[in-house]
């Protein structure tokens, strides 16, 4: 949040670790794209709602519109080559089998502004249950986060380099 203080000024936001989740209202969507506007504190005052209510409503609407998805990155890459839809691992009941250190993509079904799913209650906890281990959350874009299980072999400098490379 510190590096984006100017942009976040006058906008309600929720801190998610080192990231800040702010709120947007979708005003139009068609085959050419989606248009949205950032919610401001003055809008909240006009509506007579608190930041807590805004967050609760936004999370419910986001989940209803586009559920949380966790994909194996290899399957996502294969989708672009072979047009095979990757399995959404987020809805599994049993832990994932992590033989090697895979990279997962955390997003939403629409793959639009999907990094925001990390602000939804219980999402990061569910990822921990599925992985059965600690993990790193690496920012990739506003549309997705990379999830990397911690097997103890990665150094902070390697993770930082990975984030720079992806971005």
Regions found by a protein language model. Give the residues of each.
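A contiguous, surface-oriented mixed alpha/beta subdomain in the mid-to-C-terminal portion of proteins
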Residues: 4-167
């Amino acid at each position: 949040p510190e590096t984006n203080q100017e942009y976040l000024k006058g906008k309600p936001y929720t801190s998610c670790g080192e990231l800040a989740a702010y709120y947007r209202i979708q005003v139009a969507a068609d085959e050419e794209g989606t248009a949205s506007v950032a919610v401001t504190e003055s809008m909240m005052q006009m509506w007579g709602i608190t930041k807590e209510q805004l967050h609760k409503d936004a999370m419910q609407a986001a989940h209803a519109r586009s559920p949380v998805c966790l994909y194996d990155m290899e399957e996502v890459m294969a989708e672009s080559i072979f047009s095979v839809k990757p399995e959404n691992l987020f809805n599994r009941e049993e832990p994932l089998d992590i033989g090697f250190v895979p990279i997962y993509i955390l997003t939403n079904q629409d793959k639009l502004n999907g990094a925001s799913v990390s602000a939804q209650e219980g999402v990061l906890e569910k990822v921990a249950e599925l992985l059965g281990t600690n993990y790193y959350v690496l920012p990739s874009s506003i549309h997705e986060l990379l999830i990397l299980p911690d097997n103890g072999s990665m150094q902070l400098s390697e993770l930082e380099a990975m984030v720079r490379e992806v971005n």
